[in-house]
């Protein structure tokens, strides 16, 4: 995966503020333990450059970038120290142009049509939206995604563990940024286990897994109809007929053929099928590419290759 794909697969980009470079590697390891393999070390402190260098040299599994980059000098220093991506709070043409010309991934802050058009002119399709809470949040980005359908946003400021799922579910969101998963005070106090826990919680909230329905395989349409009639008779579950299956309420899908899975299938809803597929792949659970369905270029459904207790698993976009 390239840098942009790594950021998207992470879902959350921790904004890390370090007062002492000695804490950099421990923080990176805490993030990795929580399932987050990207981090943005900000130039808000004098320890930024040394911190980036320490992580780049000691944590090969961590994609480290530099944040709060507001000058070309900072940009060059960050890349010299090993930063693989640059994040700016605003749009600075000099910084962005240098990054583009030197093959460095860059995400400038863009909250207006003029700034977005300037970024597009330099070939960018992902921009930072900061501070998201101040500039209208999801509703503002949704409005901007109308004329700028090819642009995706990384909102920072106003995103937290309670609303991350809502952001990730939006098709115009690339990832989210925030410091809530690695509070400065916890870094200073050495509370790295807490940081790992916060990262795991953020990832879980971003994915938002929940059971959608259970699928039951039947030999044919008549058998499926008989099962649904029995469920309706016993439990008053409303029946809805479809082309390839019938539903008894929204929780039970009765297939009109012997479909995927020895015993049937389990459908799992998620805020992002693409994010779920990437995360599950890291755990060794691949998806069946031939089963993937797309809408407007976004994956909306896919089956995993593995069966669980004889059940196929179907991922669905919320």
Which residue stretches match the model-derived regions?
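N-terminal beta-strand motif that seeds the catalytic metal site of vicinal oxygen chelate
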Residues: 3-17, 203-228, 261-268
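Conserved, mostly hydrophobic/aromatic
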Residues: 14, 31, 78, 127, ...
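Catalytic beta/alpha-barrel core
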Residues: 15-17, 37-45, 62-70, 75, ...
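Core segments of cupin and vicinal oxygen chelate
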Residues: 27, 44-46, 215-253, 276-282, ...
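Catalytic cores of alpha/beta
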Residues: 27, 71-81, 114-122, 139, ...
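Glycine-rich phosphate-binding active-site loops on the catalytic face of alpha/beta enzymes
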Residues: 89-95, 128-138, 172-195
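C-terminal helical cap(s) of enzyme catalytic domains, especially alpha/beta-barrels
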Residues: 99-104, 185-208
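Vicinal oxygen chelate
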Residues: 251-256, 281-318
């Amino acid at each position: 995966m390239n840098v942009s794909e790594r950021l998207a697969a992470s879902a959350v980009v921790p904004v890390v503020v370090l007062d002492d470079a000695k804490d950099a590697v421990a923080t990176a390891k805490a993030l990795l333990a929580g399932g987050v393999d990207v981090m943005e070390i900000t130039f808000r402190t004098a320890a930024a450059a040394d911190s980036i260098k320490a992580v780049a040299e000691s944590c090969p599994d961590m994609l480290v970038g530099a944040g709060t980059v507001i000058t070309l000098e900072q940009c060059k220093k960050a890349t010299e120290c090993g930063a693989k991506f640059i994040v700016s709070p605003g749009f600075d043409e000099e910084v962005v142009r240098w990054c583009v010309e030197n093959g460095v991934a860059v995400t400038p802050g863009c909250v207006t049509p003029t700034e977005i058009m300037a970024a597009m002119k330099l070939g960018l399709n992902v921009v930072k939206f900061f501070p998201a809470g101040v500039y209208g949040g999801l509703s503002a980005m949704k409005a901007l995604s109308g004329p700028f359908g090819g642009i995706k946003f990384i909102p920072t400021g106003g995103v937290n563990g309670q609303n991350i799922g809502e952001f990730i579910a939006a098709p115009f969101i690339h990832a989210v940024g925030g410091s809530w998963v690695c509070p400065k005070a916890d870094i200073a106090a050495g509370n790295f286990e807490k940081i790992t826990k916060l990262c795991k919680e953020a990832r879980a909230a971003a994915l938002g897994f929940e059971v959608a329905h259970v699928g039951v395989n039947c030999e044919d349409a008549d058998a499926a109809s008989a099962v649904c009639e029995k469920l309706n008779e016993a439990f008053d579950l409303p029946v809805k007929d479809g082309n390839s299956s019938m539903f008894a309420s929204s929780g039970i899908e009765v297939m009109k053929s012997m479909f995927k899975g020895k015993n049937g299938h389990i459908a799992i809803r998620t805020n992002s099928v693409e994010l779920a597929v990437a995360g599950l792949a890291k755990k060794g659970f691949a998806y069946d590419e031939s089963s993937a369905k797309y809408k407007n270029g976004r994956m909306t459904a896919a089956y995993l290759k593995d069966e669980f207790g004889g059940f196929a698993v179907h991922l669905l976009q919320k």
